[in-house]
């Protein structure tokens, strides 16, 4: 589903990914762990096609890819429900309407509220609801649980695990999150795997 071969990426003179090779099968779940600044987020961005490596190749054969960023990227003039609706392709027969995704993630009361009326944790759950409603076959999750308390995090992880058979790449600093989501852990150090 996703294959990176000898991927290199730099920001100016700072090389953040050096000869990274990685293969992710359909339905497989991996967690990228390592120190801050080692390239975990950059690897997700390259995998999503948001950044082009200066060398190497990226083959993403997923029909639909969804990415949840560290900081929720919600449209501020839309309600939570409308932010989720945006990802549902026209004419798609979805398994669940947007408000159901919000309910499953414990924020049904936020459906009609704009992002500026929500806490950081609630905004993050709206972003997760949006990704799940898209019914992607590849989910790229960049520290999606960092703004959540322990109980909420546990519920959200259970919801994700029970709601999708998508391949997942999770960026996290928490081995417990990786284990709860059923991820194989890949350690990155400076510049590589």
Predicted features along the sequence, with ranges:
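The feature captures the beta-strand-to-loop junction immediately N-terminal to the Walker
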Residues: 33-35
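A short, proline-enriched helix->beta-strand linker immediately N-terminal to the Walker B motif
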Residues: 133-137
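Helix-to-loop junction immediately C-terminal to a conserved catalytic motif
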Residues: 48
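Conserved H-loop
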Residues: 166-171
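Conserved ABC ATPase signature
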Residues: 114-118, 122
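Conserved ABC ATPase "signature" region
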Residues: 95-110
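Hydrophobic anchor residue at the start of the ABC signature
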Residues: 128
């Amino acid at each position: 589903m996703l294959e990176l071969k000898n991927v290199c990426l730099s920001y100016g003179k700072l090389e953040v990914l050096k000869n990274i090779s990685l293969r992710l099968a359909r339905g497989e779940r991996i967690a990228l762990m390592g120190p801050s600044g080692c390239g975990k987020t950059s690897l997700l961005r390259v995998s999503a096609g948001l950044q082009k490596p200066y060398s190497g190749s990226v083959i993403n054969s997923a029909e639909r890819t969804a990415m949840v960023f560290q900081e929720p990227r919600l449209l501020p003039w839309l309600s939570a429900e409308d932010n989720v609706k945006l990802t549902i392709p026209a004419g798609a027969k979805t398994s669940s309407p947007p408000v159901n995704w919000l309910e499953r993630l414990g924020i049904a009361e936020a459906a009609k509220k704009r992002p500026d009326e929500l806490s950081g944790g609630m905004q993050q759950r709206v972003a997760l609801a949006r990704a799940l409603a898209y019914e992607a076959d590849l989910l790229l999750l960049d520290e999606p649980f960092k703004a959540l308390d322990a109980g909420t995090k546990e519920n959200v992880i259970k919801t994700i695990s029970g709601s999708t058979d998508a391949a997942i790449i999770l960026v996290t600093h928490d081995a417990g999150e990786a284990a709860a989501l059923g991820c194989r852990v890949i350690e990155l150090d400076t510049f590589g795997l």
